């Protein structure tokens, strides 16, 4: 059975991420969205909250499953017999970085390939970093994130 994985920190999940998940779900029978703990970053939301926000954002997609993970992505890929790794690439600088990761992941997973998805034009400028920055300065991100994330961000202000 073909299963692809879309890993990320998703802090928070954006409409750009959701767009890639929806497009991936149309192409593959099973999509695993893997939310990384990433201890090197100071997240806005803890891992459990990010997993829950992603689950709610993709609840309308029956072939998408969401998990959190603490290990190396390569370990998750091997444990779950993943067919391919999905990565979003917004720019040439993203591609350079993602290409290095793809080579490393191919080595660590005994050949699992990475597939690069460009964003839809509508979301090409959206990133979790931008969302956090706009939120920090009390800007309106309601058009850039799923509704559940917008409400979670509003609750952080209280």
Swiss-Prot record:
Entry keyword annotation includes Membrane: no
Main location: cytoplasm
Gene Ontology CC annotations of this record: cytoplasm
InterPro entries with a match to the protein in the record: Cyt_trans-like, PPAT, Rossmann-like_a/b/a_fold
Site feature Transition state stabilizer, where: 17
Pfam families: CTP_transf_like
Binding sites annotated in the UniProt record for substrate: 9, 41, 73, 87
Chain positions recorded as ATP binding sites: 9-10, 17, 88-90, 98, 123-129
Reactions it catalyzes: (R)-4'-phosphopantetheine + ATP + H(+) = 3'-dephospho-CoA + diphosphate
Cofactor(s) listed: Mg(2+)
GO term, biological process aspect, one: coenzyme A biosynthetic process
EC code: 2.7.7.3
Keywords (A to Z) from UniProt: ATP-binding, Coenzyme A biosynthesis, Cytoplasm, Magnesium, Nucleotide-binding, Nucleotidyltransferase, Transferase
Enzyme class: transferase
Keyword Transit peptide set for record: no
Family matches, as HAMAP family: PPAT_bact (MF_00151)
Family to which the UniProt record says this protein belongs: Belongs to the bacterial CoaD family.
Name of this protein: Phosphopantetheine adenylyltransferase
Organism: Pasteurella multocida (strain Pm70)
């Amino acid at each position: 059975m073909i299963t692809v994985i879309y890993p990320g920190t998703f802090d928070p999940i954006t409409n750009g991420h959701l767009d890639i998940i929806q497009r991936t779900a149309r192409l593959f029978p099973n999509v695993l969205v893997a939310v990384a703990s990433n201890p090197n970053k100071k997240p806005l939301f803890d891992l459990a909250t990010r997993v829950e926000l992603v689950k709610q954002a993709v609840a309308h997609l029956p072939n998408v499953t969401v998990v959190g993970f603490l290990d190396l992505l390569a370990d998750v890929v091997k444990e779950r017999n993943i067919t391919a790794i999905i990565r979003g690439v917004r720019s040439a600088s993203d591609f350079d970085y993602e290409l290095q990761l793809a080579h490393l992941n191919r080595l660590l997973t005994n050949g699992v390939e990475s597939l690069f998805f460009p964003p839809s034009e509508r979301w090409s400028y959206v990133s979790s970093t931008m969302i956090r920055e706009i939120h920090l300065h009390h800007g309106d991100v309601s058009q850039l994130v799923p509704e559940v994330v917008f409400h979670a961000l509003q609750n952080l202000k209280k």
